[in-house]
Amino acid sequence: MPTLEMPVAAVLDSTVGSSEALPDFTSDRYKDAYSRINAIVIEGEQEAHDNYIAIGTLLPDHVEELKRLAKMEMRHKKGFTACGKNLGVEADMDFAREFFAPLRDNFQTALGQGKTPTCLLIQALLIEAFAISAYHTYIPVSDPFARKITEGVVKDEYTHLNYGEAWLKANLESCREELLEANRENLPLIRRMLDQVAGDAAVLQMDKEDLIEDFLIAYQESLTEIGFNTREITRMAAAALVS
């Protein structure tokens, strides 16, 4: 079983999948791409932590639950940091912070305006669905150490997605129009983020179309659970086509 102290050589001892189907985890090309992909997931977990703590200022009755979610995100961050160290890769955190800047700015604007539904749509739906799609696509082509970490993380991300769904479902009638507007403003950002990372993801053998498909499936399932009808969801998903 992988441990956080497992050395670089551990990635060569895969018992999962065929070596012919997996990328060369030791190549310079792989490590270069991984430095950005790994940074994105590390920064994404940090952003999620900060966002859940911030949402707690808008939902004081939910502070303890949001702190619990935030604490989980920090565990994820530590795990993904260990994944980079296991491969001997330094994460490109400057790239990752810039990568998340548009969504971060929109979240902070909504937070300042007290728009709880928008904050939840950005963090608990869009970002969580983005993460889930990325992790699902990554797991089959990951090194054994990262596979174990990522499989544990993705289970937690569904808990976070479900939290956002439950609150928005309970408050849908009062925030429907705000959510429609937030979707129009933020879903195109997710599509651009997926496009931006496609080249590096391909080096890791993560297919761009699989990423987009998995994301849209997870996001549309959340919108259905919240209570949007098929027509509304179709129109909301169309925002992803805006470049």
Curated annotation (Swiss-Prot):
It comes from the Bacteria. Binds 2 metal cations per subunit. The catalytic dinuclear metal-binding site could be either a di-iron or a manganese-iron cofactor. Its EC number is 4.1.99.5. It catalyses: a long-chain fatty aldehyde + 2 NADPH + O2 + H(+) = a long-chain alkane + formate + 2 NADP(+) + H2O. Fe cation 1 binds at E45, E73, H76. Keywords: Iron, Lyase, Metal-binding, NADP. GO terms for molecular function: aldehyde oxygenase (deformylating) activity; transition metal ion binding. Signal peptide: none annotated. InterPro entries: Ald_deCOase (IPR022612), Ferritin-like (IPR012347), Ferritin-like_SF (IPR009078). Pfam families: Ald_deCOase. Fe cation 2 binds at E73, E128, H160. Belongs to the aldehyde decarbonylase family. Catalyzes the decarbonylation of fatty aldehydes to alkanes. Requires the presence of ferredoxin, ferredoxin reductase and NADPH for in vitro decarbonylase activity. Involved in the biosynthesis of alkanes, mainly heptadecane and pentadecane. This is Aldehyde decarbonylase. It comes from Prochlorococcus marinus (strain MIT 9313).
